[in-house]
Amino acid sequence: MLNFERKRIMGIYEILKSAHSGWRYLVIILLLVAFINALMGYLGKKPFTEGNRKLNVFALISSHIQLLLGLVLYFMNDWYKGDTAIAIQRYWKMEHIAMMVIAVVLITVGNARSKKGIDAAAKHRSIFLFFGLALIVITAAIINMVNIDPSRHLFGM
């Protein structure tokens, strides 16, 4: 019975890992599109439309789903028990999760501040600033992962 439970849990783990792996592309694309859209809106002095708001909310929601998937995987895989003296275990135990939480916080703050902006320029500026910072943090985490774990590359597992 115990072996069956372990296999079932590992099956769920693999499904969640695949979802987390695939969902990252949606998050990156939505963040990039929202960032570029906000930058063009700010520089072009364009109005902040309902479409802008929806794009930002979709980027926010997708990043929160990605974080939740990651947290479930983190605790299912026992990475939190890893030895921090070993670079790859330290990366997965501490660095990856910390950088992703920081990125999601930046996205959340940027979206919240854009709602409170008094004019279109302030709303666009909040999005391109905070989403841009989140993209920098995510990019740094990816580069760090590739450097620490040679079995991984920029666009794949």
Regions found by a protein language model. Give the residues of each.
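Membrane-embedded alpha-helical bundles that constitute the cytochrome b-like, heme-associated redox core
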Residues: 2-157
